[in-house]
Amino acid sequence: MNEAKIRLMLEAEKELTLTLTENERFMYFLGRMQFLKYESGKENLMRSDCSGSVCLALLLATGCSIRVTADALYRKYFTVRNPDRNSIRCAFFITNYDRKLGSRLYKENEVAHCAGLAGEDVVLNCVEPRSVLRSLSDLRPVYYGMDYRIEVRGLNKKALLEANKSGKDLFGPDAEFLEYRRIVSENKVTDPSTSSGAL
């Protein structure tokens, strides 16, 4: 997708999300990503993996850019236990034993999957072949049966702001994500009475 198309799309999204809170924007953009083609290592509005969808929704909702694994999201950014329902939240699927998924070996207690909360008991489950909105209650028995435990955590906004400022957790983002990041940073809200300023 070229820059002109990305700008046009993001301008339309800006109009739609102007009056929403950060949490509402996060949920909106997760919903917007339903039916994306799953592709490992991607994070754009056409293709994404699980952590990429959360990182992209964070960028578009808050204006802060990170690109990390599901495990890093859990350990560094979504550290608030028992989060408020009006906060940005994510479900994490933690393996109970060492397991190989594709070419990757996940160690016991490592997060192998994540899904951002797009509503009450609704997550964007970004898996092959396409991402889809699912009930977390429906996913729980499936993942419990595969020996995962699930934890819902809230965003630590301070950690996100610090990482965005330092640029330290931006590993291997695709070209589209970098373009979204550039456009979002150009359009940041400057009114201090509003939220931090994404689209």
Model-derived features: where do they sit?
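Secreted/periplasmic proteins that engage bacterial cell-wall peptidoglycan
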Residues: 25-70
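...with weaker cross-activation on analogous glycine-rich loops/strands in unrelated enzymes
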Residues: 7, 15-22, 63-160, 168-171, ...
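Intrinsically disordered, low-complexity
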Residues: 1-37, 146, 155-199
